[in-house]
UniProtKB/Swiss-Prot annotation:
Required for muscle development probably through the regulation of the actin-myosin cytoskeleton. During the formation of neuromuscular junctions at the larval stage, negatively regulates membrane protrusion from body wall muscles, probably through lamins such as epi-1, lam-2 and unc-52. Required for distal tip cell migration and dorsal pathfinding. Required for egg-laying. May play a role in cell motility and cell-cell interactions. This is Integrin alpha pat-2. GO terms for molecular function: integrin binding; transmembrane signaling receptor activity. It comes from Caenorhabditis briggsae. InterPro entries: FG-GAP, Int_alpha_beta-p, Integrin_alpha, Integrin_alpha_C_CS, Integrin_alpha_Ig-like_1, Integrin_alpha_Ig-like_2, Integrin_alpha_Ig-like_3, Integrin_alpha_N. The gene is pat-2. Glycans are attached at residues 74, 110, 230, 292, 610, 681, 775, 819. Residues 1008-1023 have a biased composition (Basic residues).
Length: 1224
């Protein structure tokens, strides 16, 4: 079966259902063009109405206007007593009926004065107008009529009614609630409002009327059976217990035979009964209680069931059925919100319940018809309309006074049927269709059952009190059309081209279809009528495969191309106007051809023929007769089909055996790799008979994009594939359909490769489900369908390997334990040799790393607080577009403000940047600005200092007090918007002396001995750190030492699960420097180098008599983010160590130069004094003996040695650009 389609049998059933639906919706025979519309303004004209035969065979429409000023001379001077009008059914004329023969208000002697005992002002006369089934008796009531009881002190609305027979000449007044002596009061009959509703029995029981009085006995309500010939014969229903208070029984009444005795009984509506659900109470003609009827279909509080009533035999079983209105019913299930698809309540749509009498006194079946317009109050009024369409079943009209356009009101026609009533109204008449469309509250009152124009069809009347209208709507006669359409032959072979279509298409396969019609009439129907026929070829197919011949259309003037035809040259739909004679069949013959290039050669070619009656603008025929209406209880169209010849054998049934297999080119899909394409090998095989319109369907999983399909093998081309819809399904999957053949022959194998590519924006994160299935337009046998579908799952993984390496340059530094540099140094090269630690963090793949962190803990100070590895510059990151570093304790970078000689800077040219790297630098502009701001915070101004030195030297002014006192540190602090800056934090907020109190060794010099130091005094602890984290979460010095030890024992990098992290290590109290580096966008085999340059502060080693050992920095690296939030692997740690080698002391001492000069001068002075003394003594004047040759040995003097810092501690080879520029 094809994706998204139904089997042929199912589609045919759907078509038949559509035909029934069309007949249900469009059927009507109430004429809206020739309406007799009566109008009177501002008096509630149309509040009630009914037909009444004033004279035999001469019906009038009696309309109540309960707010009217009467023209009755007997009621002169009484304000708005109300009036009843007799209106013509043929033209818009009315006259008031004077039924009250009493002169004004009745008066009675009260002492010596005559005083009124009644009040007819505002009595609402005309609120109830009701006739019997034969429409020869009439009841007219004033429910607000007031009576003054015997003491003249109590005035209560007892209500009154007038009864007429055979005209209006003789009338009787009945006020059943007006009873003496003293039955007044709300607890009795005083507020009864007799005549609020009324009903006149039609079967036997001819001398009585039933009056509803909903206000008696605390508004429990009652029914009075008033004898029309005896005023005092007026029995009523009994008083109930207080739980029935305010039920308002008698709000509506109707009569019918409910016990099978042939005498009309009474049914009363109780809209507030049954806990406000509403109910009906049935009494016999003698007012004996029979049964209660309640809504069992969809009951709800406040629906006001029983607010309107009608009685009719709707299913023609000979028993009277009851129709009950529930105008305030709310529909919670029919309407859905267009966006959310949630069901929306439709308030006050109203509904009608039909109680079918299945046996005498037994109502065993309920049917419900629900309104279609919110606030419309469908079921506010009801009337038995008779058999409107002459199908043998009585119909019902329902008023909805606030439905339709602009809430002006509407009337619905519900047809009876053998099952009761039809599920939906057959006609909806809106106020906008009547007259000029000005009626309001149209449908507040309805009446029917009288043929007023003599065409044998009962007509209806509708009241609209808000606009003061009453309308008489005539019923049109009914025309029933029967017919059939048949093919010339049962098959068409598209390869047998037997007719010439045109020069372009040449010859094609042609066939004829024959269609026959005739009509019969119900009522006064004409002998001949015009109909429009519409022929639709191949109307089951999205694209037609069969067409009418253009030359045939042009040759017949009665035929034209139908509007909506998908083609014009050779149309698939045509229209033809024909004239039929009543009772005579007429046939038509049309030729069509089937396209030889059609794809679907298995499905039959269906066609349909629809017919409609051609109406005139006036809606009338010759002789001023109403036009007929089409009977929609029979189909409005006829259908048939013709099969296409194929290779399916004698049974004309091809049964394929399709099978599909699929396999992916990988067992696991890795995210974040360069290769994001997956291939799915799909093979389809047909092991049965020919498979027509064979299609392969496969799902492109969520997170993938379709990349095309290729055929495997040299004998076939790639199938054409396209998505089945414009949007993915609810799971984000796209379904593609591929044509594999029409037909796909038996034993044919089709192999294809589907390429899908993972989306870069939203790649797959869950296991990938691969679904594929194959289908065709012909059905397979049930036991072979299982292999038409294949489903398998491919797991998704994310795999990257973070690598961390480091080394020291140089690996060993020699220093002398006896030689110190001078303390007043100014250049960085005077404090000791350069020591740099280089770290490399890399991704060994295969998946990408979105973000990683590298945290380096640097040994800036010794245990005694002296400078150790003195950082001279901020860390160098290479390549700069892959990471950035910041020193958290920025004051530890060149804290003595020495001139940086830049001897550590390599001389090689910088690494060339790609355009993408320049783009990255532009993106990081905000970070550079931040860094500049930090730098300006600590180095606010720069001046050039040239005293005692050659060339410019940069000196930075700092907060000397803070640096000298070492009372605090600079920390990087982020606000809520993730923007940050460095702030100065005093030590008393961060430092905790407990971190060192029990430690004997520093992590940067593991294994070396030192002089025991004095304990550091403890400072007051804070409850928490600046970030709000508890102090117990901070790492201790021992954690750093153990991490260094762990790395050394492992000989390099180690997976670390200890307490150290970026947040837990606080270098402010551990005499270290925390360097935070953020690394990003590392693809496979990419790396980042981070190098920290420092100088070994040799004076600290000499002062602390350190015999040597290792100085170590510690680095932590971890993946913090991937593109797909995959679980991260453990943290890596490694320690980089520099060995300090203490060398033996040299002879001599380093003495100041002035001591040497002083010694020379003293020696010279002594020599001069000695010469003068010898000269004075005449030493040089004595006779000298002969000269002897002798060797004078000079006295040994201690050699003076001077420390040359640059030559001893900073050999030139340590500054070679090769060593400091080399990368691992």
């Amino acid at each position: 079966m094809r994706e998204g389609s139904f089997p042929r049998r199912t589609r045919l059933l759907c078509l038949l259902a559509a035909v029934v639906l069309i007949s249900t919706v469009t059927s009507f025979n109430i004429d809206t063009k020739n309406v007799v519309l009566h109008h009177m303004a501002n008096n509630y004209f149309g509040y009630s109405l009914d037909f009444y035969n004033e004279q035999k065979g001469m019906p009038v429409l009696v309309v109540g206007a309960p707010e009217a000023e009467t023209t009755n001379p007997n009621l002169s001077g009484i304000r708005r007593p109300g009036a009843v009008y007799a209106c013509s059914v043929n033209r818009p004329t009315c006259r008031e009926v004077h039924v009250d023969k009493m002169k004004g208000n009745l008066k009675k002697l009260n002492g010596s004065h005559l005083v009124p005992i009644e009040d007819k002002a505002y009595q609402f006369f005309g609120a109830t107008v009701k006739s019997n089934d034969k429409h020869d008796k009439l009841l007219m009531c004033a429910p607000k009529y007031k009576y003054f009881y015997s003491k003249f002190e109590v005035i209560e609305p007892v209500g009154t009614c007038f009864y007429a027979e055979n005209g209006f000449e003789k009338t009787e007044e009945f006020s059943s609630c007006k009873q003496e002596p003293a039955r007044h009061g709300r607890h009795r009959l005083g507020y009864g409002q007799c005549g609020f509703s009324g009903a006149i029995p039609g079967k036997k029981n001819q001398d009585r009327v039933f009056l509803g009085a909903p206000g008696v006995w605390y508004w429990q309500g009652a029914i009075f059976s008033q004898n029309t010939k005896n005023q005092t014969d007026r029995p009523n229903t009994e008083y109930g217990s207080k739980e029935y208070d305010h039920d308002m029984m008698g709000y509506a009444t109707a009569t019918g035979d409910f016990d099978g005795d042939g005498i009309d009984d009474i049914v009363a509506g109780v809209p507030r009964g049954n806990d406000l659900h509403g109910k009906l109470v049935l009494y016999t003609s003698k007012l004996k209680m029979m049964i209660n009827l309640t809504d069992e279909v969809s009951t709800q509080h406040g629906q006001y069931c029983g607010g309107a009533l009608a009685v009719a035999d709707v299913n023609k079983d000979g028993r009277d059925d009851i129709i009950m209105g529930c105008p305030f019913y709310t529909d919670y299930g029919s309407v859905k919100d267009a966006k959310t698809q949630e069901r929306k309540p439709q308030y006050d749509v109203g509904k009608v319940i039909v109680f079918l009498q299945t046996a005498p006194g037994v109502f065993g079946k309920q049917l419900a018809v629900v309104g279609d317009d919110q606030w419309g109050r469908f079921g506010h009024s009801l009337a038995a309309a008779g058999d409107l369409n002459l199908d043998g079943y009585n119909d019902v009209i329902v008023g909805a006074p606030y439905a339709g356009k602009n809430k002006q009101g509407a009337v619905y026609v519900i047809h009876g049927s053998k099952d009761g009533v039809r599920e939906k109204p057959t006609q909806k008449i809106e106020a906008s269709q009547i007259g000029h469309g000005t009626a309001r509250a149209f449908g507040f009152a309805v009446a029917g059952g009288v043929d007023v124009d003599g065409n044998g069809m009962p007509d209806i009347a509708v009241g609209a009190w808000k606009s003061g209208n009453a309308a008489v709507l005539l019923t049109k006669p009914v025309v029933t059309v029967t017919g059939a359409t048949e093919p010339e032959s049962a098959l068409i072979n598209v390869e047998e081209k037997n007719c010439d279509v045109d020069g372009k298409l040449g010859k094609q396969a042609c066939r004829h279809i024959n269609t026959c019609f005739k009509y019969e009439g119900k009522g006064d129907t004409p002998n001949d009528l015009e109909f429009d026929l519409r022929f639709n070829l191949d109307d089951h197919s999205p694209e037609p495969r069969a067409y009418f011949l253009q030359k045939d259309v042009k040759s017949d003037r009665s035929i034209k191309v139908a509007s909506g035809s998908k083609t014009r040259d050779h149309p698939s739909s045509i229209e033809q106007r024909v004239r039929l004679e009543k009772g005579r069949q007429k046939c038509f013959r049309h030729r069509f051809f089937a396209s030889s290039t059609m794809k679907d050669k298995l499905s039959p070619i269906h066609w349909s023929v629809n017919y409609t009656y051609v109406e005139s603008k006036s809606g009338k025929l010759r002789g001023d007769k109403l036009e007929p209406a089409i009977d929609t209880t029979v189909p409005l169209s006829f259908q048939n089909k013709i099969n296409i010849a194929n290779n399916c054998g004698k049974d004309d049934l091809c049964v394929p055996d399709l099978k599909v297999t699929a396999v992916a080119d990988r067992e696991k899909f890795l995210l974040g790799t360069q290769d994001n394409t997956m291939l799915i090998n799909v093979t389809v095989q047909n092991g049965g008979e020919d498979s027509y319109e064979t299609k392969l369907y496969f799902d492109v999983p969520q997170g993938f994009e379709y990349g095309g399909i290729e055929s495997v093998g040299a004998d076939g081309s790639a199938p054409a594939c396209s998505p089945t819809s414009d949007e993915p399904d609810s799971d984000g999957k796209w379904t593609f359909a591929c044509d594999l053949g029409n037909p796909l022959p038996a034993n044919k194998v089709v192999s294809s490769v589907v390429r899908v590519t993972a989306s870069s924006d939203k790649p797959p994160l869950a296991p990938i489900s691969i679904n594929a299935h194959v289908n065709s337009s012909n059905d397979e046998e049930a036991h072979t369908i299982a292999d038409n579908k294949v489903t398998f799952t491919i797991p998704v993984d994310f795999k990257n390997q973070l690598s961390l390496n480091g080394r020291s340059n140089p690996e060993q530094v020699d220093f002398s334990m006896t030689n110190k540099t001078r303390s007043d140094v100014f250049d960085d090269n005077e404090i000791g040799p350069v020591v740099s630690h280089l770290y490399q963090i890399s991704n060994r793949g295969p998946s990408e790393i979105d973000a990683a962190t590298l945290d380096i803990f640097w040994p800036s100070f010794s245990t005694e607080g002296g400078h150790l590895l003195y950082i001279i510059t901020e860390p160098v990151v290479n390549p700069p577009n892959k990471g950035r570093c910041r020193v958290k304790q920025l004051q530890n970078v060149n804290p003595l403000n020495l001139r940086i000689t830049n001897e550590h800077v390599p001389t090689e040219p910088p690494v060339a940047k790609t355009p993408n790297e320049y783009s990255r630098e532009e993106d990081d502009e905000s970070y550079e600005d931040e860094t500049t701001t930090q730098s300006q915070t600590h180095h606010q101004t720069r001046t050039e200092h040239t005293q005692h030195h050659q060339g410019p030297v940069h000196v930075y002014e700092r907060d000397e007090d803070k640096i000298r006192q070492n009372t605090g540190n600079w920390q990087y602090v982020e606000d809520k918007k993730k923007k940050g800056d460095y702030e100065y934090i005093p030590d008393d907020q961060e430092y905790d002396g407990d971190d060192f109190e029990d430690d004997d060794e520093d992590f940067d010099r593991a294994g070396s001995k030192r002089v025991k130091r004095a304990p550091v005094p403890k400072k007051k602890k804070k409850e928490g750190s600046r970030s709000g984290e508890p102090r117990s979460d901070k790492a201790r010095f021992s954690d750093l030492r153990e991490a260094v030890k762990l790395s050394k024992e492992a000989g390099g990098v180690v997976d670390y699960k200890g307490p150290l992290s970026r947040a837990s290590v606080d270098c402010n109290g551990l005499r270290c420097t925390h360097i935070e580096c953020d690394i990003y966008d590392l693809k496979e085999d990419e790396f980042v180098l981070v190098e920290i340059f420092s100088r070994l502060y040799t004076n600290t080693l000499v002062d602390e008599r350190n015999p040597g050992g290792d100085i170590s920095s510690l680095a932590l690296a971890r993946v913090t983010s991937t593109k797909y939030n995959w679980p991260h692997k453990p943290t890596l740690i490694t320690a980089v160590s520099t060995n300090m080698n203490a060398i033996a002391s040299e002879e001599g001492r380093d003495l100041p130069w002035w001591l040497y000069l002083l010694a020379i001068l003293i020696g010279l002075a002594i020599l001069i004094l000695l010469i003068l003394l010898l000269w004075r003594c005449g030493f040089f004047k004595r006779n000298r003996p002969p000269t002897e040759h002798a060797e004078l040995r000079a006295e040994k003097q201690p050699a003076a040695h001077y420390a040359d810092t640059q030559s001893r501690y900073a050999p030139q080879d340590q500054y070679s650009q090769g060593r400091h520029g080399q990368m691992l």
